[in-house]
């Protein structure tokens, strides 16, 4: 560090390769580095440079240091011999050479120590210079004897190169006196030492680089690796995109293919055994439709085993990285997109045919999103808008019913087969075999639910059943949606009933239900009241259906069947040990239907999971523990059921032979019947509200408070509508009777001697009754209109949740 001082100007090299002058600001002795500063573009800049780099760019510092440390010896004049008089400065040159070589060796040792070079191995050869000659100066007699100087020349095994050793050795003669050749080489010797030091500095700079330079090289290396990796990823991306050209979901498709490559596919085969369950839950995946192919949809459903299904839901992380969330579901059966209707029927509805011949109630219903294939599975395949009913579950079950009926075991029972077909839309029941006539659902004195006015036709063969199915499907309420051009908007119920010949008692009944699309329940917050009521009814019916199936599995004492018309009609199918139910969950394989598919599968999974866990509760002693019902609960059950058994059918038609005095009480009796019906409807509504409260408590995680309030408002609206319509029907019948009485009273005035007092008295009584009926009808309609406005305001006050089921 002695050759450099603070304030000295030295050359430095920038990271971009530029070389310029800078001023030494700080010298770090321990770190062997120097801090330099320079002025550039109006500001002072600085950096830390290692000593090796400074010496490499400034070799003159080494030469200056060697010259400064080489102190000249005083010249002693002596008389030289005659033979040396031609070269009077030879002795001085030799002395200077020795001093310079000594200082050069010391300087080289310092440089090597600064570069952490191991200690040198000193050779055994010593350079001894014996000067015994007398030097004569200017003819004087005085002589000078030079002293003996021993110079040890270090030898480095690895640090010094051969060229450097040669230069140093050539600069110092071995055991000889200085001669003209040595004197001639004295000057270049010091220059050779400086050159060696410069070479060593360059080597140290190559091994010890500055931190900034190392960081730049590291960043450059990382950048090159990153670019190479990006190029590889781009090539892989192009290769994957070539597998699905033009598909925006190619990345998701590739992840699904990679996951499927780890699965072992063992699908359901036609020859496998059929299991017997009281409640069978299965799922069917339909093929991708032509519309989905045109939209570049991808298949996100995998069916690896006969009882397992996986939904590959694409998700995104916070950094927008895509990944798959694989949802696994397990059911009794899982049908892939290669299974046809015959195979689905074999494992679902066919085992239930035997149940109805043994005196049981069987139910098979299809559940799923609009366009998932429910009507295709239950009714038959579609060719455009024309449905082929021969390969649906309806027709195949009817065929097996007649085959079983002709077996010797059941032929002696003399059973009669009849069929009915109706639909449930927005809480109303319509007969599909009688021009969609509106029907009423009531309970008789034996607490049996009856569909009043339902058309039930006796059938003798499969062809007659097919005609009924075609007629009913043509009349069913449907509409066009984005998923399906012929979307079902109602629950269709097709029933095959077995009765003994000459009896009205039901021996067995098979109910096939094609449910409305489950995504319709999301429309409970729609701006259209009809759509809201339709969605609310679908929500209630599906939740009630699930709870009724749970009650069937647990053998529960109470069914919340009054919540919806669907469960009211199917009440007898959920009671008794001989009742069996089969659920077919229909799903769409497309990516756009992933959310609805998961809702459908979760609904079906809860049904089966609850049945497996909650069939019976075993006591420690091994006996089954029945569900206890208190006296208050039994009384509550009776209070909810008995009002329906005493409901009267209004009939205000009086015989034509009755006198005018007897007809007036008949009209008054009509009003009494109306009031009685209203009271019964109120009791029915109270029971329905209790069932709805029970349903909401059982499905607290699926129904929010806002949704429950909206359901209650819509229920109240539907009950009020039924009361108003029923009262209006009775008023029409009363008006027909009143018109006949009014004409008869008017005809009395054609006689000259008619009784004016009797005429006025009877007319006053008749019109008073008519006024009471009109006022009551007006008040009921005003109340109904107020409830409509209330429901409208309620639907606008909050947003309904996403239709959980």
UniProtKB/Swiss-Prot annotation:
Region (Globular): 1-274
Keywords, alphabetical: ATP-binding, Cell cycle, Cell division, Centromere, Chromosome, Chromosome partition, Coiled coil, Cytoplasm, Cytoskeleton, Microtubule, Mitosis, Motor protein, Nucleotide-binding, Phosphoprotein
GO cellular component: centrosome; chromosome, centromeric region; cortical microtubule; cytoplasm; kinesin complex; kinetochore microtubule; meiotic spindle; meiotic spindle pole
Ranges of residues in domain Kinesin motor: 278-610
Pfam families: KIF2A-like_1st, Kinesin
Tissues/organs with expression: Expressed in male germline stem cells and spermatogonia (at protein level).
Chain intervals with Polar residues compositional bias: 80-94, 158-179, 648-664
Start and end residues of each stretch annotated as Disordered: 68-94, 117-211, 633-688
Coiled-coil annotated spans: 205-244
Gene knockout outcome: Marked perturbation of mitotic spindle architecture. RNAi-knockdown in the male germline abolishes the asymmetric enrichment of Alms1a to the mother centrosome.
Modified sites of kind Phosphothreonine: 630
Subunit structure: Interacts with Alms1a (via C-terminus).
Family: Belongs to the TRAFAC class myosin-kinesin ATPase superfamily. Kinesin family. MCAK/KIF2 subfamily.
Protein name per its UniProtKB record: Kinesin-like protein Klp10A
Taxon lineage: Eukaryota, Metazoa, Ecdysozoa, Arthropoda, Hexapoda
């Amino acid at each position: 560090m002695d050759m450099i001082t603070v304030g000295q100007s030295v050359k430095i090299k920038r990271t971009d390769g530029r070389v310029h002058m800078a001023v030494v600001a700080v010298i770090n002795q321990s770190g062997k580095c120097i801090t330099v500063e320079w002025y550039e573009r109006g500001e002072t800049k600085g950096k830390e440079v290692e000593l090796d780099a400074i010496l490499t760019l400034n070799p003159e510092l080494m030469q200056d240091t060697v010259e400064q440390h080489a102190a000249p010896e005083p010249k002693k004049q002596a008389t030289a011999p005659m033979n040396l008089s031609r070269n009077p400065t030879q002795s001085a040159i030799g002395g200077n050479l020795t001093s310079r070589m000594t200082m050069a060796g010391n300087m080289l040792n310092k440089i090597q120590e600064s570069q952490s070079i191991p200690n040198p191995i000193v050779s055994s050869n010593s350079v001894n210079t014996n000067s015994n000659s007398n030097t004569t100066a200017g003819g004087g007699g005085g002589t000078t004897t030079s002293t003996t100087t021993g110079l040890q020349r270090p030898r480095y095994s690895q640090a010094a190169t051969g060229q450097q050793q040669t230069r140093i050795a050539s600069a110092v003669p071995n055991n000889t006196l200085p001669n003209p050749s040595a004197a001639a080489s004295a000057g270049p010797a010091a220059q050779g030492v400086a050159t060696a030091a410069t070479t060593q500095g360059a080597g140290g700079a190559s091994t010890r680089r500055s931190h900034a330079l190392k960081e730049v090289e590291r960043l450059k290396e990382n950048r090159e690796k990153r670019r190479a990796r990006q190029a590889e990823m781009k090539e892989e991306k192009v290769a994957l995109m070539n597998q699905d050209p033009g598909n925006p979901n190619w990345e998701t498709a590739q992840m699904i293919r990679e996951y499927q490559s780890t699965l072992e596919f063992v699908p359901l085969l036609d020859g496998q055994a059929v299991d017997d369950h009281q409640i069978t839950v299965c799922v069917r995946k339909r093929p991708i439709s032509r519309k989905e192919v045109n939209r570049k949809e991808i298949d996100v459903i995998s069916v690896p085993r006969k009882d397992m299904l996986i939904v590959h839901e694409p998700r995104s992380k916070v950094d927008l990285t895509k990944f798959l969330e694989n949802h696994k579901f397990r059911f009794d059966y899982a049908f892939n997109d290669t299974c046809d209707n015959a195979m689905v029927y074999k494992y679902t509805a066919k085992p239930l045919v035997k149940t109805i011949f043994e005196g049981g109630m069987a139910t098979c219903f299809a559940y799923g999103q609009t366009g998932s294939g429910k009507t295709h599975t239950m009714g038959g395949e579609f060719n455009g808008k024309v449905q082929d009913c021969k390969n649906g579950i309806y027709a195949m079950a009817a065929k097996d019913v007649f085959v079983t009926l002709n077996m010797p075991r059941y032929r002696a029972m003399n059973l009669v087969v009849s069929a009915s077909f109706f639909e449930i839309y927005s809480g109303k029941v319509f007969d599909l075999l009688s021009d969609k006539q509106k029907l009423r659902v009531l309970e008789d004195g034996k607490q049996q639910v009856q569909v009043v006015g339902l058309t039930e036709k006796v059938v003798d063969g499969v062809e007659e059943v097919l005609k009924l199915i075609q007629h009913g499907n043509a009349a069913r309420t449907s509409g066009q949606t984005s998923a399906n051009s012929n979307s079902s908007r109602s629950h269709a119920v097709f029933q095959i009933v077995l009765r003994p010949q000459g009896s009205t008692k039901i021996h067995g009944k098979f109910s096939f239900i094609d449910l409305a699309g489950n995504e319709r329940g999301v429309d409970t917050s729609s701006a259209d009241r009809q759509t809201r009521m339709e969605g609310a009814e679908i929500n209630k019916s599906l939740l009630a259906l699930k709870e009724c199936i749970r009650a069937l599995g647990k053998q529960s004492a109470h069914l919340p069947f009054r919540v919806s018309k669907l469960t009211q009609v199917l009440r007898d199918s959920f009671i008794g040990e001989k009742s069996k139910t089969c659920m077919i969950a229909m799903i769409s394989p497309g990516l756009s239907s992933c959310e609805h598919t998961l809702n459908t599968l979760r609904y079906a999974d809860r049904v089966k999971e609850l049945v497996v866990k909650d069939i019976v509760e075993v006591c420690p002693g091994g006996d089954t523990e029945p569900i206890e019902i208190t006296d208050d609960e039994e009384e509550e059950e009776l209070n909810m059921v008995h009002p329906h058994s005493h409901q009267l059918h209004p009939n205000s038609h009086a015989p034509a032979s009755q006198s005018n005095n007897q007809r007036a009480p008949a009209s008054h009796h009509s009003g009494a019947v109306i009031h009685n019906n209203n009271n019964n409807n109120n009791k029915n509504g109270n029971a329905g509200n209790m069932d709805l409260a029970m349903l909401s408590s059982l499905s607290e995680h699926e129904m929010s408070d806002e949704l429950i309030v909206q359901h209650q408002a819509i229920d109240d609206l539907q009950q009020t509508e039924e009361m108003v319509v029923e009262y209006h029907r009775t008023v029409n019948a009363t008006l027909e009777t009143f018109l006949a009485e009014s004409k008869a009273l008017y005809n009395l005035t054609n006689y000259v001697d008619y009784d004016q007092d009797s005429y006025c008295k009877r007319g006053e009584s008749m019109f008073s009754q008519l006024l009471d009926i009109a006022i009551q009808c007006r008040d009921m309609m005003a109340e109904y209109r107020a409830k409509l406005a209330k429901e409208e305001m309620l639907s606008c006050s909050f947003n309904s949740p996403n239709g959980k089921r």
